[in-house]
Amino acid sequence: MSYNIGVLISGDGSNLNAIINNGINVKFVVSNNQKARGLLIAKKNNIPVYTFKKLLILEEEVSKLISHYKTDLLVLAGFMKILSSKFIHSLPYNSIINLHPSLLPAFQGKDAIEQALNYGVKYTGITIHYVDEGIDTGMIIDQAILSIKEDDTPITLQARIKIIEHDLYPLTIKRLLDKKRSKKNIINECYFLI
C-alpha cells in the first residue's frame, strides 16, 4: 500500500527536494508565496503546485486537496505561516508535521538559529513535531543534536543544520507512514550528531 503526502512551503524547497529524492510520494505542493523556488522543484518532478496568498483560502484549498489526493500526512517544509486552530482540528489527529531548526522547546518561532547563537548555547539541532495550535509547541517526534562551533555564524550553522534536516526529515516521514500501517504513533526519538 502506497502512502501519500502533501507539502506546504514558503521558500527554496530544499527539504521538499530531500523528501522527493527519498522516494516519498508527494501528491501536491502548496505555497503562500508564488515566487517560492521550491515550486520549481515540484514542477520539475511533475508534482501539481498551488499558490494562495491568503491563509484562509489556502487552508480551504488544502483541505480539498487532501481529500482529492487522499493524502495521509501534511508536511510543513519551510512553511512560514501559522495554521489556524480550525484547520488543524479539521484534519485527523497528528496528521500535520513540522520541522524546526532548534531543540524544542528552546527557541520557538522565527530566527531560532540566531536565538541559539545569541544565547550562547553549546548545542542546537532540529526538531520534528506534530502541529498544534501553538507556535512550535506540538508533541515532539524526532530530534537531532548538533554542537555549535566557536566560529559558527548564522550562515554556517544554518548550512550544517540543513544537512541534518535533509537526512532526518525524509527518514521520519517514512517511519510515520510505515507506522500508519501498524496504527502506532512514534514520538520522542532522538539522534545525537555531535
Specify the residue positions occupied by each region the protein language model found:
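One-carbon transfer enzymes
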Residues: 1-194
